[in-house]
Amino acid sequence: MINSVIFDLDGTLLNSLDDLADSTNYTLRTAGYPERTRDEVRRFVGNGIYKLIERAVPTGTDKAEIDKCFDIFCRNYKKNMANKTKPYPGITDMLKTLYENGFKLAIVTNKADFAAQELCGEMFGDYVKTVVGSV
């Protein structure tokens, strides 16, 4: 009998694209690079925030500069990750129903662990007890 459910986070439970795009563009502006559209950022997500930044900066940017941009992004995103991020419609009710029916719920994501822990605690803390993000 199935008694546990494991979910992904971004694009599955949470719509986080706007905050990711805002922090990406803050980073690019700060570093003197052109900003990206929301659709471009959407195409860049999916393999963690380092890869997001690597894809967002201009082609040919060296690793030291990418590392600097990654640090800028992380500092900004820590302060702004929950400005626009919200669960998709019906997600909180679904998690509540599963929890109330005895299911153990977990989230495993390639989102940075600091962000996954904070967002899940704030938005799903009553129902999801295990959250694993990337280091």
Which functions belong to the PLM regions below?
Residues 1-43, 100:
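Active-site neighborhood of HAD-like aspartate-dependent phosphohydrolases
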Residues 17, 38, 42, 50, ...:
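Short, structured helix-loop boundary elements
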Residues 19, 23, 90, 115:
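Charged catalytic carboxylate motif
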Residues 29-31, 35, 52-60, 84, ...:
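Substrate-recognition/cap helix-loop segment adjacent to the acidic, metal-dependent catalytic center
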Residues 46-79, 97:
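A metal-dependent, Asp-based hydrolase signature
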